[in-house]
Amino acid sequence: MASSMMASTAAVARAGPAQSSMVAPFNGLRSSVAFPATRKANNDLSTLPSNGGRVSCMQVWPPEGLKKFETLSYLPPLSVEDLAKEVDYLLRNDWVPCIEFSKEGFVYRENHASPGYYDGRYWTMWKLPMFGCTDASQVIAEVEEAKKAYPEYFVRIIGFDNKRQVQCISFIAYKPT
């Protein structure tokens, strides 16, 4: 028993110094020789990044009078052809088109300090979701019907993914004048 104990102690004693040499000692920061004290002045401005002079065409969104609603709200109002292209996009992705309408096109605070159910977060659904719809003209016809029934309301189109059960796209189809 004693001989086996001594053999294991000797093995541990031999392994100790070998393990400590596996980790390199910390030498501190690099020497200052690697960092030049002076830099050559570069007066050549042609090497600086540039946007190609396109700054003059950028515009600032006016803070008053123009509300941003949802996707594509920064664009001018969409024509019927543009709406049809967007609806075709959501149909190609196998999303279910839904049409909703609301008096206010944005969240507002009327009944409480934070928005609630009656403060524009939830829109009223126009009829039922259009399950099985394969043609954009069907959706456009429903939007036109909603516009006739509620001309002073906002109308939006939603693309709903029924596999993931999430809303994938939402955009304003009609803004009242």
Swiss-Prot record:
CDD domains: RuBisCO_small. One of its GO terms (biological process) is reductive pentose-phosphate cycle. It is found in: Plastid, Chloroplast. GO terms for molecular function: ribulose-bisphosphate carboxylase activity. One of its GO terms (cellular component) is chloroplast. Residues 1-56 form a transit peptide. The keyword Transmembrane does not apply. Keywords: Calvin cycle, Carbon dioxide fixation, Chloroplast, Photorespiration, Photosynthesis, Plastid, Transit peptide. Induction: Accumulates to low levels when grown under continuous white light. Its main location: plastid. Belongs to the RuBisCO small chain family. RuBisCO catalyzes two reactions: the carboxylation of D-ribulose 1,5-bisphosphate, the primary event in carbon dioxide fixation, as well as the oxidative fragmentation of the pentose substrate. Both reactions occur simultaneously and in competition at the same active site. Although the small subunit is not catalytic it is essential for maximal activity. This protein is coded by one member of a small multigene family. The basic functional RuBisCO is composed of a large chain homodimer in a 'head-to-tail' conformation. In form I RuBisCO this homodimer is arranged in a barrel-like tetramer with the small subunits forming a tetrameric 'cap' on each end of the 'barrel'. HAMAP family: RuBisCO_S_bact (MF_00859). Heterohexadecamer of 8 large and 8 small subunits. This is Ribulose bisphosphate carboxylase small subunit, chloroplastic 5. It comes from Lemna gibba.
